[in-house]
Structures are given as C-alpha cells and as structure tokens.
C-alpha cells in the first residue's frame, strides 16, 4: 500500500524534497543527499540482514529476478501493479517473491494462500513494523501501532464498543441532515469533482457522529485545512525519508497534529465537566478503562479520535466516489436504486431511518460490488518475524508478506465475469462465496477494520440523499482510470455531471 506511488515516481520524491527544503542551496542539497544515501544504505543492510538461512529441506517461494540492483521491480510494479501481480500469479502461482527498494516482498494471492496472513499471530507476522512509521506522527504516540499489540487490541475493542446499533440509529439522521445542508450549494445542475465533495462531506459527518457536537462545531475552513495537512502525513515521502527531515509537508503535519490535539483537549475537558449525557465515541472513550482499570488519558483519547476519523476518511470517500461513476455509467441501475428508495421508504421519501437503511439491499450490493472492483487499499502488509510455511514454501523472517484485495477480488478462478460491475452477482452462487478470503476489502482476522459497519451506514445514508436529490451522468462518456500514484486508489479527474430530480 504505502510503496505504490513511490515506486511509480521513482526518485522524484527525493528531488521534490530537496527543492522544497533547500531552495537550490548547494550545501543543503548535499546534506540532504547524504542523509538520503545513508538511509538507503541502512535499508540495504537491513534487507541483507534479513537474508537468513532457511531450515534444512525448506523451499523458498519462487523469486522473480530483476537485473536492477536495489530498485528491483519497483518501476514495473509502480507503473502497473495489478497487471504485474496478475501476470506473476499466472506464471508462478499463488505465492512468489520479488525485490523493490531493497526489501523483499512475498505476495499471497488467492483465498488459500491469503489465509496465512489473516490467520497469523502478530508475533509471527507483525503489523507495527510496517505501519508504525506512518501512523505515529499522524495519530500520536501511545495509540495504534505505537503501542504493544495487546494494548492496541484493547483500544480497538473500546472503539468498537462505541460503534454499535444504538449509535448507528442516531447517526442516520445526523448524516442525512449534514448531507442535505452540504448539497444546498450545488444548485439545480452542474459538474463537480465528486471525490473532493465527498471527502469534505465524509469529514463533516464522521466528525459529527464520532467526535461529538463540541468538536464538530469547530470544524471550519481552518480546521478542515488542519485535517488536510495531517492527512498529508500519509505520504510516500513519509515512508521513504527519515521523519526528522525538515520537509514542508512534515512540518505541516506536525503543526496540524499539535493544533488538532489542542482542540480535542479542550473538548475533552469541557465534556468531562458537562452534566449532559452524550451518545458518541468521545463519551465512550471517556467512560472506558483498560483491563487493568486504568482510564484513558486525554492524549490517548485525542489520538484515538484522530485515528478513527482519518483511518476511514479516505477509504469511505474513495468508495463513495467510485460508486457514483458506476451508477452514472449504468443509468438503468441508477434508476433502480432510486426506485428502491421509494419502495422501501415511501413514495414521498420521508427522512431516513436505520431500519429502512438496512432494507436498501440493492444499494448495499452496489457498495459491495464497488468495494470488490475498487478496494481503496491495494495491498495489506505484515513483516515476517518467524519462518512461515504456505503452499509448500517457507517465507523467511524479514520478508514483507502481502495480500492484495484488488487481485483476490478479481481472480479468474473465483469470480465469474470478474471485471464487470454486477451487484446482482451476490444473489447467485459463485466460486468466491465458498472462499473465506476471496473478498477482503476490510481485511480479515485480528486486524479486520472495526469501522466497516459505520462505513456502510455513512455511505448508504449519503448516497440515499444524493439519489433522492439528483440524477448523475458521465461527462462525454468519461469513466476515470485508477490513480495508482496515491496510497489510496482514487479515481483520476473524478468530475461528474448532475441534475436535480423533478418533483
């Protein structure tokens, strides 16, 4: 996931970083270059150090050789990652390894092979070593991948306890009101960047539902920019370059982290003093304790609130945007979704309820099919800490072990008419239905996304509102290609045409 755009752009990250930091100053440029070179040497030594001897009789996964030192297959993979993986699957089977930027990646494709990753224990296939470098500067210390896995699992359990049906029933009306207010500015017709619009709306609705009214009330343009700067910390430069480099994007990220934390601290203190009952995640965190009875600190609460929002913001907005284009391309399907609104909710389309939302089965399948063809995250990774055996091969410690939802969800062996957008496929028997890990847009096992149910409530409510208000069309038949240069696979130039429905 985190390597993808980096690999496509090659050395451009370094060049841009130098230019931003040095302004062309020769000495500064040399210092940055030295730091970068030392980082590469470190990564190379790390990779060599991981080349451990396999147990006697063990067989390594098929290795895809590259004549290019260090970079390996970075350029080919970055240019067309899905094609690269699918071709490798056809040639080498479900398990294979290759090198990129000094690291060895072993992919597990197909449900049977992917089971190794999703069923693994953290001490065998470790997530912190892969994701901690990115998430800690954004979320803060003491939460998520900055803490021992046992503590992280407790934090996830606490958050999940707040993502319950009782709260969802309240969230539907909150999200619907936010959406109606947001779309007032769209007017009768026009053309919009639907990804940008939905990104803004997802932030507004998620903040209101999850953070509470105190924090939502402060979400103005300045705070929205702080979120954007903080979100900018999830970058290829953040993965590749040392965190202490004075890059503008790093400085903006760190400043935004401090300012947002301060906003949250004030809201937390105000809530602690309040006598009014509240039903949101903030209150859940304030009322919760760890197993040993210790309450969460204000800093932990603030970090978990940031993590909960940003972990789902891009994925939900990307999925929502892609679904808009699938519906705009298939107008009969879009009409059926609109008719479903009237059939389930009533001809006069009254305000939505959670119970009605559950009965919007076609819309539900449209989201599910969008997540199949356009899962926001192409690769889920773990660091092998112990030798792992799968399909007759042994993966040594030090390998980055990967599963690709994108590839698994379009394998010829598992999916009939695999590249077609067909929401009704889930009404029929298909090979994938008998495979546990053929469909994994939210992951599986111990690291399955805890926000899956909230994401469905959020996306279904927003798109129910959009379908009630507007018809959507492609502009001159344009359907976006996938932007593989970003960490989340967004649509390229996602501008869509809309027209208000006649009453």
Curated annotation (Swiss-Prot):
Instruction: List the protein's name.
Output: Lanosterol 14-alpha demethylase
Chain residues that bind heme: 449
Localization, per the record, is: Endoplasmic reticulum membrane; Microsome membrane
Which SUPFAM superfamilies does the entry mention? Cytochrome P450
Q: How is it modified after translation?
A: Ubiquitinated by MARCHF6, leading to proteasomal degradation.
Give the record's free-text account of how this protein's activity is regulated: Inhibited by azalanstat. Inhibited by azole antifungal agents ketoconazole, itraconazole and fluconazole.
GO BP term, pick one: negative regulation of protein secretion
Q: Report the superkingdom from the record.
A: Eukaryota
- Phenotype upon changing residue 136 to A/V: Decreases lanosterol 14-alpha demethylase activity
Outcome of mutating residue 314 to F/A/K/D, per the record?
A: Significantly decreases lanosterol 14-alpha demethylase activity. Increases the susceptibility to ketoconazole
Its transmembrane ranges are 24-44
Its Gene Ontology cellular component terms are: acrosomal vesicle; endoplasmic reticulum membrane
Q: Which family does it belong to?
A: Belongs to the cytochrome P450 family.
- What is catalyzed by this enzyme? a 14alpha-methyl steroid + 3 reduced [NADPH--hemoprotein reductase] + 3 O2 = a Delta(14) steroid + formate + 3 oxidized [NADPH--hemoprotein reductase] + 4 H2O + 4 H(+); lanosterol + 3 reduced [NADPH--hemoprotein reductase] + 3 O2 = 4,4-dimethyl-5alpha-cholesta-8,14,24-trien-3beta-ol + formate + 3 oxidized [NADPH--hemoprotein reductase] + 4 H2O + 4 H(+); 24,25-dihydrolanosterol + 3 reduced [NADPH--hemoprotein reductase] + 3 O2 = 4,4-dimethyl-8,14-cholestadien-3beta-ol + formate + 3 oxidized [NADPH--hemoprotein reductase] + 4 H2O + 4 H(+); a 14alpha-methyl steroid + reduced [NADPH--hemoprotein reductase] + O2 = a 14alpha-hydroxymethyl steroid + oxidized [NADPH--hemoprotein reductase] + H2O + H(+)
Membrane topology note? Single-pass membrane protein
The pathway where this protein functions is: Steroid biosynthesis; zymosterol biosynthesis; zymosterol from lanosterol: step 1/6
Organism of origin is Rattus norvegicus
Instruction: Please give the cofactor(s) recorded in the UniProt entry for this protein.
Output: heme
């Amino acid at each position: 996931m985190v390597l993808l755009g980096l690999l496509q752009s090659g050395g451009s990250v370094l060049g841009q970083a130098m230019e931003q930091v040095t302004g062309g100053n020769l000495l500064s440029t040399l210092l940055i270059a030295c730091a970068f070179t030392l980082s590469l040497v470190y990564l190379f030594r790390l990779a060599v150090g991981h080349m451990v001897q396999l147990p006697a009789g063990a067989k390594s996964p098929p290795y895809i050789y590259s004549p290019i030192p260090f970079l390996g297959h970075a350029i080919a993979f970055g240019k067309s990652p899905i094609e690269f993986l699918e071709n490798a699957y056809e040639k080498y089977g479900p398990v294979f390894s290759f090198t990129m930027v000094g690291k060895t990646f072993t992919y597990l494709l197909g449900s049977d092979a992917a089971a190794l990753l999703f069923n693994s224990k953290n001490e065998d296939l470790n997530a912190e070593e892969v994701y901690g470098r990115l998430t800690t500067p954004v979320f803060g210390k003491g939460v998520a991948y900055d803490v021992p896995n046992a503590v992280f699992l407790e934090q996830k359990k606490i958050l999940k306890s707040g993502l319950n049906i009782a709260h969802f029933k309240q969230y539907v009306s909150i999200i619907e009101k936010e959406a109606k207010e947001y779309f007032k500015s769209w007017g009768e017709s026009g053309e919009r960047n639907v990804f940008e619009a939905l990104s803004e709306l997802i932030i507004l609705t998620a903040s209101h539902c999850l953070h509470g009214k105190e924090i939502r009330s402060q979400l103005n343009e300045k705070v929205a920019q702080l979120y954007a700067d903080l979100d900018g910390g999830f970058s290829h430069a953040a993965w590749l370059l040392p965190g202490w480099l004075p890059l503008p994007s790093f400085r903006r990220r760190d400043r935004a982290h401090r300012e947002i934390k301060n906003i949250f601290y004030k809201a937390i203190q105000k809530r602690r003093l309040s006598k009014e009952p509240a039903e949101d995640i903030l209150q859940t965190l304030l009322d919760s304790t760890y197993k040993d009875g210790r309450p969460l600190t204000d800093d932990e609460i603030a970090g978990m609130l940031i993590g909960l929002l940003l972990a789902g913001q891009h994925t939900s907005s990307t999925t929502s945007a892609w679904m808009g284009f699938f519906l705009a391309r298939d107008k009969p399907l879009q009409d059926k979704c609109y008719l479903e609104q009237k059939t389930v909710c009533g001809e006069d389309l009254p305000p939505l309820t959670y119970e009605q939302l559950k009965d919007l089965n076609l819309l539900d399948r449209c989201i599910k099919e969008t997540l199949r063809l356009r899962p926001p995250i192409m690769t889920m990774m773990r660091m092998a800490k112990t030798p792992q055996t799968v399909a007759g091969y042994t993966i040594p410690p030090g390998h980055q072990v990967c599963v690709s939802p994108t590839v698994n969800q379009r394998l010829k062996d598992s999916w009939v008419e695999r590249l077609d957008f067909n929401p009704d496929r889930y009404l029929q028997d298909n090979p994938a239905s008998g495979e546990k890990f053929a469909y994994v847009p939210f992951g599986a096992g111990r690291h399955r996304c805890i926000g899956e149910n909230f994401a469905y409530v959020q996306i279904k409510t927003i798109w129910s509102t959009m379908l009630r208000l507007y018809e959507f069309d492609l502009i001159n038949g344009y359907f976006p290609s996938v932007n593989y240069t970003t960490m989340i696979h967004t649509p390229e130039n996602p501008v869509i045409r809309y027209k208000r429905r006649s009453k």
